[in-house]
C-alpha cells in the first residue's frame, strides 16, 4: 500500500578502506558524478519528502562536494552497523510516513524498481528488495516458512543449511516510520560481528504478525555495491552499456557501443552518428543529422542540425547553430558560439568568442573575447591578443573582413566591415570599413650572402 508521504535514508558513513583512497568511498565517481549523487537523484525522482544522509568518514568533504541544502545530514560518529546508522536517523522520522532505506555505494538502483518496492509494501509491514544469486557467499540469507519471509540471517551467523539458500538480502527496504522506530529500539548487537543489524527488524516484524513483501529488481546489477575500484569499474561498464543500448534503440548510431561514455544527459535529434571513443559530459543536445568523430569530448553544449565535429575535438559550454563544421583537433572553450555555416578547423581555439554566419577560421588560430561578423576569413596563425597580464579586452571584426595569415589583433580593437588585413600584420588601432591594413618590416635582399661558419 502506498502512503501519501515518504522519506529516504541513505547510508554513506563508511570509509571504504579497500578503495585505498583519501576520498570517502561514496564520492568516487560513476559516469562522471559521485556514486551517492546517483542515489540522491533516484530518491528525488521518487518524490522523497526528505532525504537523510547518514555520514561519518570525510563528512566535510561530502558536504563541500554535494552542496545540497535539501539534504538532512545525520552524523554516525561510530560505525556500529546498519541498524546503528538507522538509529541515528530515527529521530527525524514522522510516524505517518514511509521510510525507504538506500545505500550510497549502490549507485545503479533504478527509480522503477524502487517504485515497485514502494507499491508492494503491505500496510503495517515491510517491503524488502531481494535477489537470487548462484553464489550467495557473504550475503545475508532470506529465511521463509510456507513461502513467507520470516527473517534474514547474516552469512557469518548462518548454519550450513541456511548457507545453501540462494535468495539474499540487498539491504534495501521500506517500512512505516512509527513501526521502524519501534523495531530499531529493540535491536541488539548479540551476533558474530558485535554490530546492530537493520536486518533483525525483519524477524521482529514477523513476530508481530506483520507481512514482509519481497520484491526483485529488474536487473541484479541494480543492487550491486562497491567496495573496491574493480567493482566500481565493472559497474561503470554496466551503466555505459545500458546507456548505449537506450541510445541505439532510440535511433542514435553508435559506431562502437563499447567505446562510448555518457557522463551526463544527452538529447539527440534524428539520424545522429557518433564514432568510437566519444565522451559526453553534462547536458548536451545534438540536433538532427549531427556527426561526431572519433575521440571527441562534448560537454554542456548545444550542437545544431547538420553540424559535423571531426575527430579529437573538444567542445565545452559552446553553442553551434546549424551546419557548422569543426576540427579535427579543434577546441571550443566556454562561451564559444558559432553561427550557421561557420567553420573552425584544426588547431583552432575559441573562448568567449562568436564566429558569424559562414565565417571560417581554418587552422592554427586563437580567438578569445572576440565578436566576429559574417563571411569573415581568419587566416592561419591569427591571434586575438586579449590579455595584458591583468585584464581581458575585446576584439570586434565586422562582416566580410579578410584577415591574412600570421595576424595579431591587439585588443581592444575594432576592424570595420569589408576591411582587409595583410598577412603578418600586427593591428593595434581600429580599422575603418573597407581599408587595407599592413604592418611589415621592409624586406631586405643581400646578394651573395654566406652563412657564418661554426668555430672548431
From Swiss-Prot:
**Gene3D superfamilies in the cross-refs:** Hexapeptide repeat proteins, Spore Coat Polysaccharide Biosynthesis Protein SpsA, Chain A
**One Pfam family, short name:** Hexapep
The EC number of this protein is 2.7.7.23, 2.3.1.157
Cofactors that this protein relies on: Mg(2+)
Report residue spans for region: Linker: 230-250
Which residue ranges are recorded for the region named N-acetyltransferase?
251-456
The record lists Mg(2+) as bound by 105, 227
Q: Which residues bind UDP-N-acetyl-alpha-D-glucosamine?
A: 11-14, 25, 76, 81-82, 103-105, 140, 154, 169, 227, 333, 351, 366, 377
| Compartmental location | Cytoplasm
Going by the UniProt record, its keywords in alphabetical order are:
Acyltransferase, Cell shape, Cell wall biogenesis/degradation, Cytoplasm, Magnesium, Metal-binding, Multifunctional enzyme, Nucleotidyltransferase, Peptidoglycan synthesis, Repeat, Transferase
State any GO CC term. cytoplasm
Subunit relationships: Homotrimer.
The record's similarity note reads: In the N-terminal section; belongs to the N-acetylglucosamine-1-phosphate uridyltransferase family. In the C-terminal section; belongs to the transferase hexapeptide repeat family.
Query: What's the protein called, per UniProt?
Result: Bifunctional protein GlmU
Organism (species):
Salmonella paratyphi B (strain ATCC BAA-1250 / SPB7)
Name the gene for this chain.
glmU
Amino acid at each position: 500500500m502506498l502512503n501519501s508521504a515518504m522519506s529516504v535514508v541513505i547510508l554513506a558513513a563508511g570509509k571504504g578502506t579497500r578503495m585505498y583512497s583519501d576520498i570517502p568511498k561514496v564520492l568516487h565517481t560513476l559516469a562522471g558524478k559521485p556514486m551517492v549523487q546517483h542515489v540522491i537523484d533516484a530518491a528525488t525522482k521518487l518524490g522523497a519528502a526528505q532525504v537523510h544522509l547518514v555520514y561519518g568518514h570525510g563528512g566535510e568533504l561530502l558536504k563541500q562536494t554535494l552542496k545540497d541544502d535539501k539534504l538532512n545530514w545525520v552524523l554516525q560518529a561510530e560505525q556500529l552497523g546498519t541498524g546503528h546508522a538507522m538509529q541515528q536517523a530515527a529521530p527525524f522520522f514522522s510516524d505517518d510516513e514511509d521510510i525507504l532505506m538506500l545505500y550510497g555505494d549502490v549507485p545503479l538502483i533504478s527509480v522503477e524498481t524502487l517504485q515497485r518496492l514502494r507499491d508492494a509494501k503491505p500496510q503495517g509491514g515491510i517491503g524488502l528488495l531481494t535477489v537470487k544469486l548462484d553464489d550467495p557467499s557473504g550475503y545475508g540469507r532470506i529465511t521463509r516458512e510456507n513461502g513467507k519471509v520470516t527473517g534474514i540471517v547474516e552469512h557469518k551467523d548462518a548454519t550450513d543449511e541456511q548457507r545453501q539458500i540462494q535468495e539474499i538480502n540487498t539491504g534495501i527496504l521500506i517500512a512505516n516510520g512509527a513501526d521502524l522506530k519501534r523495531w530499531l529500539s529493540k535491536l541488539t548487537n548479540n551476533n558474530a560481528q558485535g554490530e546492530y543489524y537493520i536486518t533483525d527488524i525483519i524477524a521482529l516484524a514477523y513476530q508481530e504478525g506483520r507481512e514482509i513483501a519481497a520484491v526483485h529488481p529488474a536487473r541484479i546489477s541494480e543492487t550491486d555495491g562497491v567496495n573496491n575500484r574493480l567493482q566500481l569499474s565493472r559497474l561503470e561498464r554496466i551503466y555505459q552499456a545500458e546507456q548505449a543500448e537506450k541510445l541505439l534503440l532510440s535511433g542514435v548510431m553508435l559506431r562502437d557501443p563499447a567505446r562510448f561514455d555518457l557522463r551526463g544527459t544527452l538529447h539527440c535529434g534524428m539520424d545522429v552518428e557518433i564514432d568510437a571513443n566519444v565522451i559526453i559530459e553534462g547536458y548536451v543536445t545534438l540536433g538532427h543529422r549531427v556527426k561526431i568523430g572519433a575521440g571527441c569530448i562534448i560537454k554542456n553544449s548545444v550542437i545544431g542540425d547538420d553540424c559535423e565535429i571531426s575527430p579529437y575535438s573538444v567542445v565545452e559550454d559552446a553553442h553551434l547553430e546549424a551546419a557548422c563544421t569543426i576540427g579535427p583537433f579543434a577546441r571550443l572553450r566556454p562561451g564559444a558560439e558559432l553561427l550557421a555555416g561557420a567553420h573552425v578547423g584544426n588547431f583552432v581555439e575559441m573562448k568567449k568568442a562568436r564566429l558569424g554566419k559562414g565565417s571560417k577560421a581554418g587552422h592554427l588560430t586563437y580567438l578569445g573575447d572576440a565578436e566576429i561578423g559574417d563571411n569573415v576569413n581568419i587566416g592561419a596563425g591569427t591571434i586575438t591578443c586579449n590579455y595584458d597580464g591583468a585584464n581581458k579586452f575585446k576584439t570586434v571584426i565586422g562582416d566580410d573582413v579578410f584577415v591574412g595569415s600570421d595576424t595579431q589583433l591587439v585588443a581592444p580593437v575594432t576592424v570595420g566591415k569589408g576591411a582587409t588585413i595583410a598577412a603578418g600584420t600586427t593591428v593595434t588601432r581600429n580599422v575603418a570599413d573597407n581599408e587595407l591594413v599592413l604592418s611589415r618590416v621592409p624586406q631586405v635582399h643581400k646578394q651573395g650572402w654566406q652563412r657564418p661558419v661554426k668555430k672548431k
